[in-house]
């Protein structure tokens, strides 16, 4: 799963750089998010204690509140925009937004209207909407993909766990123009697939 999320981060950055060079490299993720235990996945994650070992965090990976109505009672989409402004992030600099379908063992979901507005905002900004479906995908929430509860279609889906019934396999799914940013073989390592 972490490797799939790393690939999602790489695709977002590459996508942004194709559009606007190094002016469009910011990745927005959410407080309390967990995207894995590798370097990039932990920087994208929203749990500060898991980042203590990382000496130099990437300043272009930022977290905003996750609107679950519990830890963050403010579920307005405007909070997303206000948070970016507070962090000094210009909308046009955002290459991608990565979110889990739900957070944690208690399955905290965002309101569907929030996610629908986020989808529209990403489209307007030419930023990729990336769903980390490692925990929620393959029927775990009652739909094949967890994001189906929101009535949106992401640009990139990072998935694992349920894909293989326990084998260490993950996948990244996306539109052709995103997935073709790298030629075959260039996103793999010694023992991974392509």
What is each model feature region?
Residues 1-194:
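Conserved N-terminal phosphate-binding loop of PLP-dependent enzymes in the Aspartate aminotransferase
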